[in-house]
């Protein structure tokens, strides 16, 4: 949580457990690491290896001290995603791929002239590809070649707040202008008109024909087929 540190919930006992060692930590991202360990990204502190059994956390260095300081101590958070069973993505000013077996980092190859704008956020993994977004683009990372390319770019003053991919492979974008649908096959985008809300804070596709939307402190559902 944002200031409350790490908490766990056991769905069988329906009980929460709080880890006092993480109190006041602003947790930006969590992902699996090695057996019995998690990686946690803390805002303005860095990335740590966390042991849920003991509550202990130890600093984890991204590439080297210089890179780690640049990514973690300048008012931004590093987001984490396990994109394959053998690798973890550290999303910062670039995409840093960490090989769990070799314990090495590689930076994803970017398109020439393509600048990452704002914070990189994970959308998800689908077969050999991982999808990521910043405030202006949706990117596709080829997990085999470690190449990053932009699939979608928004124009002018449109800002991407949230992206989710549905069961058909289409992208739904929550922006400061509302809901946008992007079809990667035809490369067409459609702004969905509505008077119910303006800017979208967060959205997620349930993979069952609905897009769930958080906007204006309310929850909405867009029925994809029924429109």
Model-identified regions with their sequence ranges:
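Carboxylate-rich, polar loop motifs that coordinate divalent cations or form catalytic acidic clusters
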Residues: 1-227
């Amino acid at each position: 949580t944002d200031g409350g540190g790490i908490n766990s919930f056991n769905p069988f006992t329906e009980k929460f457990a709080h880890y006092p060692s993480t109190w006041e930590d602003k947790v930006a991202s969590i992902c699996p690491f090695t057996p019995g360990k998690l990686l946690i990204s803390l805002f303005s502190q860095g990335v740590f290896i966390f042991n849920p059994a003991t509550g202990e956390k130890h600093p984890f260095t991204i590439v080297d001290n210089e890179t780690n300081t640049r990514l973690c101590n300048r008012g931004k958070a590093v987001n984490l995603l396990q994109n394959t069973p053998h690798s973890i993505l550290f999303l910062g000013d670039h995409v840093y791929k960490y090989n769990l077996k070799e314990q090495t980092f590689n930076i994803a190859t970017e398109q020439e002239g393509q600048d990452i704008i704002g914070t990189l956020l994970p959308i998800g993994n689908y077969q050999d590809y991982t999808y990521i977004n910043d405030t202006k683009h949706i990117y596709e990372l080829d997990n085999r070649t470690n190449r990053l390319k932009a699939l979608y770019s928004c124009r002018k003053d449109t800002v991407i707040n949230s992206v989710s991919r549905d069961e058909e492979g289409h992208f739904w974008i929550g922006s400061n202008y509302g809901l946008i649908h992007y079809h990667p096959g035809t490369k067409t985008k459609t702004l969905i008109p509505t008077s119910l809300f303006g800017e979208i804070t967060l959205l997620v596709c349930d993979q069952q024909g609905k897009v769930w939307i958080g906007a204006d402190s309310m929850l909405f559902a867009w029925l994809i087929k029924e429109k």
